[in-house]
A protein has these predicted regions:
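Surface-exposed, charged secondary-structure patches
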Residues: 71-118
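Short, solvent-exposed secondary-structure junction/capping segments
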Residues: 34-38, 52-66
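Short, low-complexity N-terminal intrinsically disordered segments enriched in polar/charged residues
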Residues: 17-50
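Sec-dependent N-terminal signal peptides
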Residues: 3-13
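Short beta-strand edge/turn micro-motifs at domain boundaries
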Residues: 123-149
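Extracytoplasmic
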Residues: 43, 51-53, 95, 104, ...
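Hydrophobic pocket/interface hotspot
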Residues: 36, 48, 56, 109, ...
Length: 153
């Protein structure tokens, strides 16, 4: 009978331990995405590349009025070259982490954003990131986003 209170205490601690681990992993995922945008803001293509998984994929789609949506693959190397090439304005993508879902070594991030060239608003939309947990931490495996100039949050 004396063992029952101890077992109940241990059983109550399991969800707390799981929640702490989930919170730690969520913060680690957010840290990777934040490092991606910090690198972009600083024009540091090496910092951006460190956040990417090998064979990462960026998708882009065009959504022109009266035209079917077209999906294409953006060149990672082209993107990194653009980030690292000096440009007059800071590329400032301001994200908010609306949803972070994690199952084992897979994470999905859904984040509304606003993009500024320097202090001038350019566009807004939603970023969708897929991350994988590799030996050296969470890495971005896939990015796709929407883009528009109005009807932002």
């Amino acid at each position: 009978m004396k063992l029952l209170p101890l077992l109940l205490l241990l059983a109550a601690a399991i969800p707390v331990a799981h929640a702490q681990k989930a919170s730690f992993e969520t913060e680690a995922v957010k840290k990777t995405v934040t490092a991606f945008f910090d690198g972009m803001r600083h024009g540091d293509s090496t910092a951006v590349r460190r956040t990417l998984a090998p064979a990462a994929v960026f998708h882009a789609f065009s959504n022109q009025p009266n035209q079917p949506t077209k999906l294409g693959i953006e060149s990672i190397n082209g993107f990194l070259k653009s980030v690292g090439t000096p440009h007059p304005e800071i590329w400032d993508e301001r994200v908010q982490f609306e949803r972070v879902l994690i199952d084992a070594n897979l994470a999905s991030v859904w984040a509304p954003y606003e993009f500024y060239l320097g202090s001038k608003f350019s566009h807004c939309g939603y970023d969708s990131f897929q991350l994988v947990k590799l030996a050296d931490g969470w890495k971005i495996a896939h990015v796709i986003d929407t883009r528009r100039k109005e009807k932002c949050r």
